């Protein structure tokens, strides 16, 4: 499981608020947070870069720990 929700909560933001920053619908962010959908590498990088710009100090590995994808495949 990824740590998007944990990072979002640390910022004190709702899913709706963070989704707006990305220009996404709240449901897309929810799907990523719950693991219903897996973000591609580009989306993962965008998420981490944005979290850092918003004041979090995180890395790709801290938000998306290695082995996060249940089937073991890297998404792109």
Describe each model-derived feature in a short phrase.
Residues 33, 43, 51:
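DNA major-groove recognition helix of helix-turn-helix
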Residues 3, 28-31, 47, 62:
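Residue-level recognition of specific faces of alpha-helices
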Residues 5, 9, 23, 34-36:
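Residue-level detection of the helix-turn-helix DNA-binding "recognition helix"
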Residues 1-10, 58:
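A short, Lys/Arg-rich alpha-helix, primarily the initiator
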Residues 8, 19, 48:
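The alpha-helix within a helix-turn-helix
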Residues 37, 41, 49, 56-76:
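Short, charged recognition helix plus adjacent turn
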Residues 3, 14, 40-43:
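Residues that mark the N-terminal boundary/hinge immediately upstream of a DNA-recognition element
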Residues 12-31:
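Short alpha-helical DNA-recognition segment
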């Amino acid at each position: 499981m990824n740590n998007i929700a944990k990072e979002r909560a640390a910022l004190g933001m709702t899913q709706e608020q963070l989704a707006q920053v990305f220009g996404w619908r709240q449901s897309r962010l929810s799907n990523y947070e719950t693991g219903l959908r897996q973000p591609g590498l580009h989306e993962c990088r965008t998420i981490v870069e944005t979290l850092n710009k918003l004041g979090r100090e995180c890395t790709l590995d801290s938000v998306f720990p290695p082995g996060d994808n249940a089937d073991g495949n890297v998404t792109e």
